[in-house]
Amino acid sequence: MAATMSEGGVDDFQSGYADTEHNVFEDYVNAAEGDASGKDQNIYARFLKDAHTRLYPGCKYSWLSFLVHLYHLKCLHGWSQESFTALMGLLSASLPPEANLPKTYYQAKKIISELGLDYVKIHACPKDCILFRGDFAKNDFCHVCQSSRWKVDEKASKGKRKEKRRPAKVLRYFPLIPRIQRLFSTTITSDDMRWHEEGRVRDGKLRHPADGEAWKDFDDRHDFANDARNVRLGLASDGFNPFGNKNLKHSTWPVMLVPYNLPPWICMKQTSLMLSMIIPGPNSPSNDVDVYLEPLIDELLELWKGVETFDASSEKKFPLRAALLWTINDFPALAYLYGWSTGGTYACPSCGPATKSFHLKKGNKMCYMGHRRWLPQHHQYRRQRKLFDGTVETGLAPETMSGTTVLGMLEGKEFVLGKKVPTTKQSNKDVEVESVKKRKRSSGEKKNQTKGSSGKEKKPEDWLKKRSIFFKLPYWEHNKLRHNLDVMHLEKNVCENFIGTLLDILGKTKDGLNARLDLVQLGDRENLHPIVDSEGKQSIPDAPFTMTRAQKEILCPVIQNLQTPDGYASNISRCVNMKDCTLNGLKSHDDHVLLQDILPVALRSCYPSKEVMKIVVQLANFFKMLCSKVVDLSELDKLQESIVMTLCDMERIFVPSFFTVSVHLMVHLVEEVKLGGPV
């Protein structure tokens, strides 16, 4: 249940339920058949009582927890209904009479279903064009791509067996409104839902999203804040392989909702997270994720107007409202929900058209630099040509794109969702040609990432691949923070860049012959240009970030022999290859620990140069302060100045290929902390 129960939560019900000798199944049936106004209260009271009634004297399980555990085992191990009924009969005969368990599968299911944890199955087009709901609920074919709603049974089509229609794709959706209403069905969670207004400490420090500017701006714009019980939500989603087989490509997407009204030590607990839907695989929904979000958006629109809900604290009904503040995703998933392409010239969703990037011809990748724009106007780095890209920087830091700006860029554009259908209106002939074969880019096309397939220069608005479904929410356009950057994955990518480059790990290093040849084409840092010997062979000179074999042999044993407290990190020693002096197979938390705690210490006796050592220490301090549970608002401006200087120092030392979009995105993290609160 979404609401956690404790001993104090049932005091009001104890006196009325002193007698434990009762027919539980009949009580639930009678409660369910009662009048609509008292139905929920009667069932909930019964659940509270049975959650604290021992199955029999001396048993460690309560009556309800024992039944839920049994039903959970049935689902996990695929027990048939007959076997479950037989087991219930055996248990009823074996246990003391006061256990009074249901005798059949039907009776057990009847009780479990009253928990309200049901979901709705919604058929979907196999090409992610539409959901078969509303006006399309009775259709057998998708009106966009003409795909069948049903799987094709070859044996049935040949007459070998009777045809049984099975949906090609099914979305499992968990209704949101009853789950939010449940948070107010007990005084424990009902009081916690007002904590952000009544219990929050206001001392100028960031501890909770309510301390951030985005929350306060939302309150100023709307009358939503008039009632502290109104719910603020965050949405998180990402793909994963539920089968645990890395050789099998499968991506199932759960969508989670987080109620931010709760205190920070409660809202991120597993019991508080709400599973909104499960988007089926085997392929990622990509930009078509909006199709699957339709039921959630419909409920959010209803919740914005208000839904009558009973509050256990005041023992009165009130119009409950809810709003979605933002989403939290890794960078690829952010592109799917935002609709902004996170690759190519304008990959940064914050800078948008003001993204400063260029294509490295030899390395065949994009480079995102130009961080001197965030420096003060008269800073000396702005005028130093030789240390940077040979230019004087006069530009100013770009402003983050607002929702109004995005809608302006979408004006006049139309999109069609679904696989193998045009992203904008095109002729049927063009669609057929594109769907027949995916054409590979030629080398000429790769050279200029701003040119489309027609050879025309691509405009910044072409990076918008759709109009996000979130803009259907009347308040979304004006939300100051709509899509959060995932600090965990950004930190992992930055750490991998450092580890791969310092240890020269094959496939992960950002340095190499092509990276140095790009320096030649850019006319930058002649001391790092490749050296050609008498036989015509090219070699690359050592850079300030190049570690010698001896230095690597000092660093790797330190990491391999490191002993940490239990639960602090995984066994990082297994990732160390002493033969090649490399690190492989690091998880996100391993990179987090390495960058913040281990590298600043482990590199002290073997750093390649003082400049690199200084950068590592600065990055460690940056992420440590950024990821603190309590952030001092007065220190954030200094933190922003620090990361800008660090990025500029990195531009002086590292080759351009080092500057992937993840490295650039660090410059926006402080702003997001100001808006949304601590990480």
Segments the model singles out, each with a brief description of its role:
Residues 21, 32, 52, 79-83, ...:
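Membrane-entry segments of alpha-helical transmembrane domains in multi-pass membrane proteins
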Residues 25, 482-485, 492-495, 516-519, ...:
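Membrane-proximal termini and loops of membrane proteins
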Residues 99-545, 613, 617-677:
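Domain-level cores of phosphate- or acyl-group-handling catalytic modules
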Residues 596-606:
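Extended amphipathic alpha-helical scaffold segments
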Residues 57-65, 79, 116-120, 266-269, ...:
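Helix-boundary capping/turn motifs
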Residues 2-121, 131-133:
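N-terminal alpha-helical interaction blocks
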